[in-house]
């Protein structure tokens, strides 16, 4: 569903999300400073959009939504990786179809390097790639995939002639074109990362199906994934919590950079390393592997401490309580009694996705 976030809603959301220590429970002053700075940046960014597009038309990139503004924030491209749809829109007062045409072509031909694109500015930094990220995920009006600029241009012209729509936001007219992704777009994106997933699986001893399920739930295999908590990349790793924990376990100082976490291979490696830490260190006292897997999944979203506190404030006693339960009872408790509604839903989503990957 399209994420239309008004600025009044965004501000408290940013504060609450950024104060969470999701995917790790490390807390330090640097993390607070970085997060507060990110909140300010996001507030200013949302304000710029609201001033031009209107209160109900604020649209910002998220874990499963690529949103890029250009033309002094007058044109935007939105890929909804959940719904499988691309929407290109403009409020340009002069030659709106020219603005749409250019944005359609660049969106269809953009590469898969998130480090080259700033989603929080209107800088037109989208580079046309010989290996477009959306290749095979979009077919033109003749049923062909789009790799070259000539085919993308022809398709853009076709779309502007046959699918151009307009609506008013109270400030100006919004012109838009929507393109559907192919039905199996999720599988096509997942296929890009299978090799990296297998490598990380062997390296850390984490089941491939779990890694894929986490990626699907976190980002829908969107390498450009960002969040209001500043979680980054395919597995939505936060630099100053899970990222720092993994670096420390590997004998590295500091935290992974944004560019590091936007690199798909590095992101998958770091996210998988953190899953291994949860399984082998933080939650190792849970004896039944299925019960421990449920705990690991929930902890990847909300932290190991919050999982154990569902059962007892004492970590050892919590593990002992879990060990006396059946895996089904552990699942039931985590999906109904965890204090975070997001974490309760998360276990259900990841577990369901993992079952589907195991059947393949």
Curated annotation (Swiss-Prot):
A Pfam family reported for this protein in Swiss-Prot or TrEMBL: Mltc_N
| Subcellular location per the Swiss-Prot or TrEMBL entry | Cell outer membrane
What UniProt keywords are attached to this protein's entry? Cell outer membrane, Cell wall biogenesis/degradation, Lipoprotein, Lyase, Membrane, Palmitate, Signal
The yes or no answer to whether the keyword Lipoprotein is present is: yes
Fetch the Gene3D superfamilies from UniProt: 1.10.530.10
- For this UniProt entry, what's an example GO CC term? cell outer membrane
GO biological process per UniProt = cell wall macromolecule catabolic process; cell wall organization; peptidoglycan metabolic process
Superkingdom of this protein's organism: Bacteria
InterPro entries the record matches: Lysozyme-like_dom_sf, Murein_transglycosylaseC, Murein_transglycosylaseC_N, Transglyc_AS, Transglycosylase_SLT_dom_1
Q: Where is the lipid attached (S-diacylglycerol cysteine)?
A: 17
Catalyses: Exolytic cleavage of the (1->4)-beta-glycosidic linkage between N-acetylmuramic acid (MurNAc) and N-acetylglucosamine (GlcNAc) residues in peptidoglycan, from either the reducing or the non-reducing ends of the peptidoglycan chains, with concomitant formation of a 1,6-anhydrobond in the MurNAc residue
What CDD domains does the annotation carry? LT_MltC_MltE
Task: Report the EC number(s), separated by commas if there are several.
Answer: 4.2.2.n1
Q: Where is the lipid attached (N-palmitoyl cysteine)?
A: 17
Q: What is its main location?
A: membrane
Residues making up the signal peptide according to the UniProt record = 1-16
Q: What class of enzyme is it?
A: lyase
Any one GO MF term held by the record is: hydrolase activity, acting on glycosyl bonds
Protein's membrane topology:
Lipid-anchor
UniProt family annotation: Belongs to the transglycosylase Slt family.
Role this protein plays: Murein-degrading enzyme. May play a role in recycling of muropeptides during cell elongation and/or cell division.
Q: This protein is called what?
A: Membrane-bound lytic murein transglycosylase C
